[in-house]
């Protein structure tokens, strides 16, 4: 499927590469290519843990800003009321006075200079570790190793307030210091080193325990039969009404495609598994499947309710250029 839609490469979890068939000669330090022609890079475990680990990862340093202490909740209600939600509900303002400080202890005030000093130290540590890692690997490999470091974008600046500055200092050090490596994208690496081992990656994901249990377990498995049924029906509609002109039916078909995609959003199943805003996630799945199903029968029976269609579009107007024919 990836190759069919022009995707040249993807990134898999560490075990997705280590358990590939046949076993990759260079482990996670060189890409592999599947029989279908899609190239896979694997997350590097060492560099990932240095940033992501909840125990000793960089973002958890005690000098960094505490994400969970916000004046929207900390300040006296009468003082903060003009700056929170118009209905009086406390919300995050983005203004946070405290640093992480430690575990299970009173929080100290955030000190910008301490945080910036820590960034400098950690960026240097990351650089030294990659330098040593690449030097070691190069002695065992006859091609340059690649250290693939994928991270969620929301880590930098959102969860880890100092994260963007850490990236800036790291890149600055790499540019000015004498390094035994260069920064490179997967696409650039493929262009420079096009020969690679043919192997099939093992199934993997970024979710807890590395497979699919976050999105398929006893708390959310009920949703899958409805999602599969809706997907089959979407394909049925596209086959029955191909290449509709600029008609009400086409608008309804496109809206069906929107509702299906929104119902399939992996966030709903993730939220249910994690136990946060569970009822909201259940309701979202039910609402999107419900709207899809109602439109499905209206289209099949040639009884499209224009007012209902407009109502649904006003609620869910994402993907304005969507074309239902992708399901043909």
Model-predicted segments: where are they?
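A conserved hydrophobic secondary-structure block that centers on an alpha-helix together
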Residues: 1-4
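His/Asp/Glu-enriched short active-site or ligand-binding loop at hydrolase and phosphoryl-transfer sites
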Residues: 8-20, 184-185
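Active-site and substrate-binding clefts of carbohydrate-active enzymes
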Residues: 21-22, 26-328
């Amino acid at each position: 499927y990836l190759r069919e839609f022009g995707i040249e490469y993807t990134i898999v979890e560490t075990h997705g590469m280590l358990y590939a068939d046949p076993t990759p000669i260079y482990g996670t330090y060189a890409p592999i290519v599947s029989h279908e022609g899609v190239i896979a890079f694997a997350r590097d475990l060492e560099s990932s843990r240095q940033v992501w680990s909840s125990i000793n990862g960089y973002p958890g340093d005690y000098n960094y800003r505490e994400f969970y202490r916000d004046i929207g909740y900390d300040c006296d209600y009468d003082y903060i009321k003009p700056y929170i939600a118009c209905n009086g509900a406390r919300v995050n303002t983005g203004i946070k006075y405290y640093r992480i400080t430690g575990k299970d202890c009173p929080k100290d005030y955030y000190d910008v200079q301490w945080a910036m000093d820590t960034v400098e130290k950690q960026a240097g540590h990351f650089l030294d570790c990659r330098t040593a890692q690449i030097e070691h690997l190069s002695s065992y490999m006859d091609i340059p190793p690649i250290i693939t470091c994928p991270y969620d974008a929301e880590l930098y600046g959102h969860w880890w307030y100092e994260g963007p500055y850490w990236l800036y200092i790291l890149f600055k050090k790499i540019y000015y210091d004498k390094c035994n490596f260069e920064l490179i994208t997967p696409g650039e690496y493929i262009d420079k080193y096009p020969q690679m081992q043919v192997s099939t990656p093992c199934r993997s994901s970024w979710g807890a325990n590395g497979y699919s249990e976050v999105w398929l377990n006893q708390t959310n498995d009920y949703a899958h039969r409805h999602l599969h049924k809706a997907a089959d029906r979407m394909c049925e509609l596209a086959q029955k009404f191909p290449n509709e002109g600029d008609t009400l039916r086409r608008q309804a078909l496109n809206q069906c495609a929107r509702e299906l995609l929104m119902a399939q959003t992996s966030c709903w199943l993730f939220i249910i598994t994690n136990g946060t805003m569970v009822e909201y996630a259940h309701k979202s799945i039910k609402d999107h499947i419900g709207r899809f199903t109602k439109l499905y029968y209206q289209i099949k029976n040639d009884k499209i309710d224009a007012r209902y269609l407009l109502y649904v579009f006003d609620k869910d107007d994402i993907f304005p250029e969507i074309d239902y024919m992708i399901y043909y």
